[in-house]
């Protein structure tokens, strides 16, 4: 592992924990409760504040702000934190806030994500692995984005929304309710527009699994998602269908995005 390099113009608090092989570029500011894993790269003009942990080999581009106080009027300075996993790419002007006392106290970002320029992750969000936020996408507080979710550019996700594994949100889309795993959401007032077929095929879903998901989705569209899911759950189902049904029947503070009438 290469030695750690810190530019002379960077301000790194002596109490910060900086791992082996890190690169901290010009005009970065690193607070006393920050922990950087091995090989983390902060390009330049990056601010990392609060109790923020950044995992190994994550690269942060200029003017990102990580761990500054939540944009929540109820926040009163309580001790909370931001945890960012390994091998993430955090592009220019990205903002990520720590948790709040009322939301569990921790914002978590998984591994291998791509957060494009200007995207935002608010307080208390739980973000899975390999998640992509395209330019200027915003995720409000308390949201859950499971693994392999993609949120298109200029899209917004309402607070407390859950987005299931492998779902795709199109560009310029407002997501106000939960999105089932493998769903495709489009339109200014987001609606469920079928399955994320490209994502399913990339992950090796078989033709039979895709047909089963389509059949399930057709039945869900005929009535209440929860009532229909309870009925479908009584039958034998493959793992992908079971995952969707379990998601629908799980705890939630929101309704579900339904197919466009």
Swiss-Prot record:
Family the UniProt entry places it in: Belongs to the transferase hexapeptide repeat family. LpxA subfamily.
Pathway per the UniProt entry: Glycolipid biosynthesis; lipid IV(A) biosynthesis; lipid IV(A) from (3R)-3-hydroxytetradecanoyl-[acyl-carrier-protein] and UDP-N-acetyl-alpha-D-glucosamine: step 1/6
Top-level taxon in the UniProt lineage: Bacteria
Reported function: Involved in the biosynthesis of lipid A, a phosphorylated glycolipid that anchors the lipopolysaccharide to the outer membrane of the cell.
Cellular location(s): Cytoplasm
Gene3D superfamilies in the cross-refs: Hexapeptide repeat proteins, Udp N-acetylglucosamine O-acyltransferase, C-terminal domain
Record's keyword annotation contains Lipid biosynthesis: yes
Main location group: cytoplasm
GO biological process, one term: lipid A biosynthetic process
Protein name stated in the entry: Acyl-[acyl-carrier-protein]--UDP-N-acetylglucosamine O-acyltransferase
GO cellular component: cytoplasm; membrane
Swiss-Prot/TrEMBL keywords: Acyltransferase, Cytoplasm, Lipid A biosynthesis, Lipid biosynthesis, Lipid metabolism, Repeat, Transferase
Pfam families tied to this protein: Acetyltransf_11
Enzyme Commission code(s) on record: 2.3.1.129
Subunit structure: Homotrimer.
InterPro entries, A to Z: Acetyltransf_C, Acetyltransf_C_sf, Hexapep_transf_CS, Lipid_A_LpxA, Trimer_LpxA-like_sf
Enzyme class, spelled out: transferase
Catalysed reactions listed for this entry: a (3R)-hydroxyacyl-[ACP] + UDP-N-acetyl-alpha-D-glucosamine = a UDP-3-O-[(3R)-3-hydroxyacyl]-N-acetyl-alpha-D-glucosamine + holo-[ACP]
Keyword Repeat: yes
Gene Ontology terms, MF aspect: acyl-[acyl-carrier-protein]-UDP-N-acetylglucosamine O-acyltransferase activity
